[in-house]
Structure formats: structure tokens, C-alpha cells
């Protein structure tokens, strides 16, 4: 069997004894977090190591040099970013080029039917001129695109848990629920479940390398993986109907 092993660093230790260098992208934290990840997973190296957020308190050169030190030490093969802006990614590549070092190979952005701007607009110049992979997260919009929140928040669901108030405020907007209902009807018409349609829509984008799938049951994962088989059915007509329902297609950047 073959797999790609990744880890990420930024938020670090959350306890009351949290120290300044136990979070962020300082050289100290990136090096220590990588070492600890290797120990936890009992491996010699990571295929991919993410800077989980940008860090305004650390110079970009320090981040680039640290990630390349880890590459040279054989602890990671590639490094990436997560939730970085297009400008921050370009800056990292410019710094890396000036130093003769490796820039980030992949970005991990949120991407789904309700969150399209980064993949479909902001990053287009990067995809064209630099070339960069993406590992998207939340293809089901925190479960909204499963349809399970159409009639409220079920007990035991993620949005019902303490500490997820921010997600409820972000995800449950009446207009979105109306669109989810319409998308569900389209999925029924196409003979698939809404999560399958939603994930297939994401991975159809040629700039999406892979998608992070979350599931609480094995059956949910098995169902969602049917998106790969369904992908050929996402023709131009179906994609146009989805865009018509969503009404949020990003404007392409002008050059």
C-alpha cells in the first residue's frame, strides 16, 4: 500500500502553560513541532509539512529557510501552506527564489459550493505562473451540504456541540439552506446523494489535487467516495444548473 503522510504546525500547545514559542511559525516552533510529529507517528520523515496559518510576527525568510532546513535534514520532502492569501504564497515563492530554496508546493484552503473565491479566482495566477497543488478542506461546508441541517440542528451533530457557536453562525444562513434543498432535489434527479454531488463538484475543478473527507461512520465515507464514480456525469449542463442554484460564481481577475 502507498500513502502520503502530512502534518502541520501553527496553533501548538493550548494549555495554561503555553509559551510564546509553542505556537506560530517561528523556527523554534516549526522545528520542534516537526520532531514531535515524527515521534508520535513513529516515522523518519513527512511527505508534506504545512504552515497551518500565516504568521505576521515571523519574517517570511525565516519560515522559508526553516522549511528548507527540514527538507535538507530529510525530515520532510515538501512543505505547504494552509489558509494563506495569494499575496502571502507569492511572497514565499519570491523569497525562496531569491535564496535558491524550495517554495511551498501545496496550499490547503477551504473550498466548497459556498466558498469558492480562493480556488476559482484568487489563486488562478498562482496556478498558472507558479504551479501549486491544493488539498481542500470542508468540501461539505461543515456538513451543511449533506442536507442534515435542513430542518434544524440535530442533537449530537457537530453544530450542536459546545464550542461550535462560531460555526453555527457561519454555516446556518437561511439562504444557504434554501439552496441546499434545491441541490438535494438535483442530486435526487441525478440518482445520487447530495454529499456525493457536492464532493464530485469540488474535485472536478482541475486545480483541486485532493479533498479532505470527514466522517463519523465508515458507511458515510464509503458513500462519499462514490463521488469518484459519479464524476463523469458532471457535464456542462449539470454544472450550469448548479451555478444557477448557487448564484455565487466568482468573477475572474482581470489582467
Q: Predicted segment positions?
A:
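Short amphipathic alpha-helices and their capping/turn segments at secondary-structure boundaries
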Residues: 1, 33-39, 123-131
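N-terminal small/glycine-rich loop or linker at the start of catalytic domains
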Residues: 6-21, 45-50
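Beta/alpha (TIM)-barrel catalytic core signal, keyed to glycine-rich beta->alpha loops juxtaposed to Asp/Glu
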Residues: 60-246
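Short, acidic/polar
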Residues: 24-41, 89-94
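Active-site mouth loops of central-metabolism enzymes
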Residues: 16-31, 52-58
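A short, structured active-site edge motif that brings together acidic residues
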Residues: 1-14, 107-111
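N-terminal binding-site loop/beta-alpha segment at the start of enzyme catalytic domains
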Residues: 1-4, 44, 72
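Active-site groove signature of glycoside hydrolases
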Residues: 38-59
Amino acid at each position: 500500500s502507498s500513502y502520503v503522510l502530512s502534518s502541520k504546525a501553527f496553533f501548538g500547545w493550548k494549555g495554561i502553560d503555553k509559551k510564546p514559542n509553542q505556537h506560530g511559525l517561528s523556527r523554534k516552533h516549526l522545528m520542534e513541532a516537526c520532531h514531535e510529529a515524527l515521534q508520535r507517528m513513529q516515522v523518519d520523515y513527512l511527505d508534506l509539512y504545512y504552515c497551518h496559518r500565516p504568521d505576521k510576527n515571523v519574517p517570511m525568510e525565516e519560515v522559508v529557510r526553516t522549511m528548507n532546513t527540514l527538507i535538507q535534514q530529510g525530515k520532510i520532502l515538501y512543505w505547504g501552506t494552509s489558509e494563506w492569501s495569494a499575496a502571502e504564497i507569492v511572497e514565499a515563492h519570491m523569497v525562496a527564489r531569491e535564496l535558491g530554496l524550495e517554495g511551498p508546493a501545496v496550499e490547503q484552503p477551504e473550498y466548497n459550493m459556498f466558498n469558492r473565491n480562493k480556488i476559482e479566482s484568487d489563486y488562478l495566477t498562482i496556478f498558472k505562473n507558479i504551479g501549486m497543488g491544493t488539498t481542500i478542506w470542508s468540501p461539505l461546508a461543515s456538513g451543511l451540504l449533506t442536507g442534515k441541517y435542513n430542518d434544524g440542528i440535530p442533537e449530537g451533530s457537530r453544530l450542536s456541540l459546545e464550542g461550535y457557536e462560531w460555526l453555527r453562525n457561519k454555516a446556518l444562513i437561511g439562504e444557504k439552506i434554501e439552496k441546499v434543498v434545491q441541490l438535494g432535489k438535483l442530486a435526487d434527479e441525478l440518482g445520487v446523494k447530495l454529499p456525493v454531488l457536492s464532493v464530485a463538484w469540488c474535485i472536478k475543478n482541475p486545480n483541486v489535487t485532493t479533498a479532505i473527507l470527514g466522517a463519523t461512520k465508515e458507511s458515510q465515507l464509503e458513500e462519499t467516495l462514490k463521488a469518484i464514480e459519479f464524476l463523469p456525469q458532471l457535464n456542462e449542463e449539470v454544472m450550469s444548473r448548479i451555478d444557477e442554484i448557487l448564484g455565487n460564481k466568482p468573477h475572474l481577475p482581470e489582467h
